[in-house]
Amino acid sequence: MKQIIKKGSFLTLMFLLLGCLSLYAADNGLITKQITIELEKAGTLPDRITSIKKYEITNLKIIGEINGTDLRMIREMAGRDYISNSTDGKLSVLDLSKAKIVEGGVCYYYDCYTSNDVIGDRAFAGCSGLTSLTLPAGITKIGDDAFGGCSGLTSLTLPAGITEIDDGAFWYCSGLTSLNLPAGITYIGWYAFEGCSGLTSLTLPAGITRISRGAFIDCSGLTSLTLPAGITEIEPWAFIGCSGLTSLTLPAGITKIGSDAFRGCSGLTNLTLPAGITEIGYSAFYGCSGLTSLTLPAGITWIGGEAFRGCSGLTSIYVYAEKVPIIGSNAFTGVDAKKCTVYVPMGTYNDYWLSDFGYYFENIVEFDATGIDKTTTSTDVEEVARYSVNGQRLSAPTKGLNIVKYSDGSVKKVAVR
């Protein structure tokens, strides 16, 4: 009888233990419930988790100071060791909101070591299994390639104190669909968001003064982008392959657009360049096949080679420059010479016709570059011809912009409502 009771008690105990474990472990043995570990001293995380359990935890929260030793352990749990070899780690969700990164410990990635309040270079590089990450509140900087290749990351919370995002910081984080950039950020490095094809919208902080080289290459999902007023330069390759962009408002202070800056942005339909623009770089808008209308400001002096090559959808170009800009080779190759009409300031027709504009375009029309007239009230002149913005002859006023030629030889751009 005693043996039967003992056996029954043992089975009951085992049942209770298995029931408790089921709260933490999934069918595949992974621990899905958040595990919270509070560290009394930096560098002690490896002492708190056994070598077996570290590969079973999928959701981890750390409280306290962490250094390079701890970060190396976290990387192993997230699928990559310190020399970027893959591990059996399955960590998916990481909450460091109550943690503080401090200097010290061993290297976490080759020769990379932790610094106080910095997400260091390549801190989470290659950890593609991470899906959600909350950073420590005190972080001020995100280093080079810090999240490079974290393609599974869909949720990332950046603390308010960050002022700098370095080169390649979010390189190919293709799973990110949105990201709130703190207002205090003043620098975004080269290729910082290259390959973030999942991003659909992004608002850059007011302190940003330039778009760095290659910062948004192949962000093909980006449909909306808000650029701060303080930006003065868009560097080369900044938005190559951002085919989802349909419209873009460039800040008034921009003076230069770098080479290949918007190459392959085939979704853009119209573009007005700010008055301060003087130079358009080589291949800046190459392959923007969706572009139908282009406005070049009065101060434009140079249009780089192949700048608008392949912009096959262009039907109208308004040039406000009294002095004909210098045009590089093949600047408008691929634009339909018959379909596209170039509108130039009054009195400059001959200059433009004799220039490279006359080589690329058959239809050059003078217009009043001083502004848009809503109506024509003068009784001294009569309308003799009317055209649409793409150069087609109109028999009557048509809603939208009309190009009207008068008996005194003047041409005006008229808005018809």
Residue ranges and their predicted role:
Residues 120-125, 143-148, 166-171, 189-194, ...:
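Consensus positions within tandem repeat domains that build extended binding/scaffold surfaces
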Residues 401-417:
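C-terminal tail/sorting-segment detector
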Residues 2-12:
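Bacterial N-terminal signal peptides that target proteins for export
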Residues 11-22:
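Bacterial N-terminal signal peptides
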Residues 367-390:
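Residue-level detector of functionally pivotal "anchor" positions at catalytic/ligand-binding pockets or at interdomain
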Residues 43-53, 69-79, 326-334, 394:
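Short, T/G/N/S-enriched strand-turn elements that build extracellular solenoid repeat scaffolds
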Residues 23-27:
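Boundary at the C-terminal end of the N-terminal hydrophobic targeting segment
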